[in-house]
Every structure is written in C-alpha cells, then in structure tokens.
C-alpha cells in the first residue's frame, strides 16, 4: 500500500542490526526529535537510515541505502535489518498505525524494492551541504 505523503508520520524505527546499532528502538512521539550522542554512537547511521525510508512524491530527494551504506572490503552490510513504524490519518481523521515496514540486506541488494516505500518528501542536510552553503555565502 502506498500512502499519500502528507498523511504519513514516522512513529518508531527499530534497528535490529545496522553498522554499530544493534537492537535499538527510537520512538518519535513529538513533532521534533533530537538525535544526540558522543562520537561513534550511531547518530549519523540513524540519520542516513531515516533518509532512505521513503519515496519522494516528485519534489523530495530519493535516497537509497547504497548511497550511505556502500559495500566495501570491510563491510557488505549483509545481515543489516531495520523496521519503520508509520502512522496514517484516515479520511475520518482517525490515526492508524501501519504494520512495521522491514528494510534489510540479505545478500547483494537491499529490500524491499524502493518503489514500494511509503511516499513522503525527505530532504537530507548533511555537514557537506551546510559547509558548501557557508562557502557560497562568504564568497
């Protein structure tokens, strides 16, 4: 089921295994969530995974897992697994939790197929984006 983008909200993400994250659940119960921690605690892993959960509606950015989790000699990412729990608001205004959407890499490719991801615009702003903007402003 593909849901209209403005009616879907991420409520929870569960990392079974992704990089250094193992059996970690993050709940998104408020409109704004801060991802904080010491260096190496997995903040960037969380942000990269969040950027890959959705299909854009045509205006957003289309991030895919290999963009951030590139296979290399040290890590193929095989065995990685996470789940996202989304909520939709029905036409009657009643919120409904959707079944968890599982994302994983069993062998050589990530699943599920990208076209089956829920629709929601995502804009990833990394440190490189911020630095390039600052350089452009100062010129």
Regions found by a protein language model. Give the residues of each.
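A short, basic N-terminal segment
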Residues: 1-16, 92-117
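Pre-Walker A-like glycine/lysine-rich segment at the N-terminus of P-loop NTPase domains
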Residues: 1-48
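Extended, charged alpha-helical "arm/stalk" segments used for dimerization and assembly
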Residues: 114-132
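A general secondary-structure signal for short beta-strands and their flanking turns/coil
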Residues: 8, 21, 79-81, 120
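Generic structural motif
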Residues: 18, 31, 87-91, 128-130
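Conserved P-loop NTP-binding catalytic core
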Residues: 29, 45-102
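A broad, low-specificity signal marking well-ordered, structured residues that form hydrophobic/aromatic
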Residues: 33, 82-84, 122-123
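Conserved small/polar residues in nucleotide/adenosyl-binding loops
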Residues: 135-137
